[in-house]
From Swiss-Prot:
Entry binding sites for Zn(2+) 1: C44, T46, H67, C154
Name listed for the protein in its UniProt record: Alcohol dehydrogenase 1
Organism: Emericella nidulans (strain FGSC A4 / ATCC 38163 / CBS 112.46 / NRRL 194 / M139)
One Gene Ontology MF term: zinc ion binding
Subunit-structure text: Homotetramer.
SUPFAM superfamilies: GroES-like (SSF50129), NAD(P)-binding Rossmann-fold domains (SSF51735)
Length: 350
């Protein structure tokens, strides 16, 4: 398989951008790595945070962002046995980990202190060819469309893990805050596939239409609701509130409201990462109602296998729009304005 020496990529040359669409060298895989010809890459809010330096974690610069890359294996290191040339593969947020620490040994490899993060500490998938450690790359079954699979590699795995962390059971209700975004659209479907009832919380008629098309039972529009807490509680069958709340919002206020409409003994799972935000909860209310508040990061390798299996069986469809790689700056603008329903997937130039 012929591999060029140069490729097109979107590169942030300094924190805060701007992005530069230019040619850069094609990397060569190390002994335990695969080189993937990226066909499609999803665009996540994390990619924008990385470029802007919003988080207190040092970010590589210059940086090729992206961590939802789906494509074909075109080269591999001599130690790689998991993949063959021509296999479909996905490169995720967790590009690699040490494999030796306590967290890696107990399958909490996302918590590894030496984890390598695609599009953050190592170059990611907004380029035609990207590297990934073979043990952390995902196998995408043959016949599964790569454009539709791309958002599952981060958004899908992340919300699937969050639902598992919430401990919510079939027949119970989950409130998904930020339901109309890329993560939320997938969270609704995973919840439904797991037999969980959904109250979708977001703003705007376009997001309402999308959520209703995904089968949500109730949509609460925070831009129109006079009493969001009452509306979420009223949407649950017994009026006692949601058994779990999945927080995917990118602003702070929803993180402060969640304890008001989660039911007693309920669980609040924080996944969204608004910059400089804090979680605050009244202590007495949290204690006497036995509310659990926890964070959920990305899934481990097994979570990735399970999340992709839901997709391969046709239980999950990622609502997405396709755009060329050169349009990434426009997509970031829409993202900053909160005007994206579902997910954007970038198509790489041939």
């Amino acid at each position: 398989m012929s591999i060029p020496t140069m490729q097109w990529a979107q590169v942030a040359e300094k924190v805060g951008g701007p992005l530069v669409y230019k040619q850069i060298p094609v990397p060569k895989p190390g002994p335990d790595q695969i080189l993937v010809k990226i066909r499609y890459s999803g665009v996540c809010h994390t990619d924008l945070h990385a470029m802007m330096g919003h988080w207190p974690i040092p970010v590589k610069m210059p940086l090729v962002g992206g961590h939802e890359g789906a494509g074909i294996v075109v080269a591999k290191g001599e130690l790689v046995h998991e993949f063959e040339i021509g296999d479909q593969a996905g490169i995720k947020w967790l590009n690699g980990s040490c494999g030796e620490c306590e967290f890696c040994r107990q399958s909490d490899d996302p918590l590894c202190a030496r984890a390598q993060l695609s599009g953050y500490t190592v170059d990611g998938t907004f380029q035609q060819y990207a590297l990934g450690k073979a043990s952390h790359a995902s196998k995408i079954p043959a016949g599964v469309p790569l454009d539709a699979a791309a958002p599952v590699l981060c958004a899908g795995i992340t919300v699937y893990k969050g639902l598992k962390e919430a401990g919510v059971r079939p027949g119970q209700t989950v409130a998904i805050v930020g339901a109309g975004g890329g993560l939320g659209s997938l969270a609704q479907q995973y919840a439904k596939a797991m037999g969980i009832r959904v109250v979708a919380v977001d703003g705007g008629d376009e997001k309402r239409a999308m959520c209703e098309s995904l089968g949500t039972e109730t949509y609460v529009d925070f831009t129109k609701s006079k009493d969001l807490v009452a509306d979420v509680k009223a949407a649950t069958p017994d009026g006692l509130g949601a058994h779990a709340v999945i927080l995917l919002a990118v602003s702070e206020k929803p993180f402060q409201q969640a304890t008001e409409y989660v039911r007693s003994r309920g669980t609040i799972v924080a996944i969204g990462l608004p910059p400089d935000a804090y979680l605050k909860a009244p202590v007495i209310n949290t204690v006497v109602r036995m509310i659990t508040i926890k964070g959920s990061y990305v899934g481990n390798r097994q979570d990735g296998v399970e999340a992709l299996d839901f997709f391969a069986r046709g239980l999950i469809k990622a609502p997405f729009k396709t755009a060329p790689l050169k349009d990434l700056p426009k997509i970031y603008e829409l993202m900053e304005q909160g005007r994206i329903a579902g997910r954007y997937v970038l198509e790489m130039p041939e």
